[in-house]
Swiss-Prot record:
GO terms for molecular function: guanine phosphoribosyltransferase activity; hypoxanthine phosphoribosyltransferase activity; magnesium ion binding; xanthine phosphoribosyltransferase activity. Purine salvage pathway enzyme that catalyzes the transfer of the ribosyl-5-phosphate group from 5-phospho-alpha-D-ribose 1-diphosphate (PRPP) to the N9 position of the 6-oxopurines guanine and xanthine to form the corresponding ribonucleotides GMP (guanosine 5'-monophosphate) and XMP (xanthosine 5'-monophosphate), with the release of PPi. To a lesser extent, also acts on hypoxanthine. Guanine binds at D105. It is a peripheral membrane protein. The lineage of its organism: Bacteria, Pseudomonadati, Pseudomonadota, Alphaproteobacteria, Acetobacterales. It is found in: Cell inner membrane. This is Xanthine-guanine phosphoribosyltransferase. It comes from Gluconobacter oxydans (strain 621H) (Gluconobacter suboxydans).
Amino acid sequence: MTANQTPQTVHYATVTWDQLHRDARLLAATLMQKHGPFRGIVAITRGGLIPAAILGREMGCRLIESVSVISYAGEEGTQHEPKVVKPPVAAGDGEGFLIVDDLVDSGVTARIVRELLPKAVFACLYAKPEGKPFTDHYVTEVAQDTWVLFPWDTAPLFVPPLVRSEGE
């Protein structure tokens, strides 16, 4: 960082299991109302796996396929040229299928999956402004500078009380 640069502030949003479940059920209700039944679901790995399982249960959809696109390296989230490492073979061109992800961020992964499955419906729980054009449905918009922490990314941690008793 040079003298003229200021540190970039990163904001965090923590999604709990309860919130994730509520949002997934809300998304399922919207999808059932607007699209009726789907032949199958394509989960974008890894973040779309758990939302896809919840949506599959709520919508009575048992055929769940996956697609794996690698575009980030490491937990620091360094973006690289995206590469499909596992295509969604069972989904054909996507007709009758629902693509599911936890979050659409920059839209890089979503764009690639949409190219693979042009006839599919794309839905995610959370969308950032840059990624919104790539999804048909989402539950909550998140600011572009926010890092979303999902339940599978975090662990419960004991935090000691602020006040200790005198006997300790």
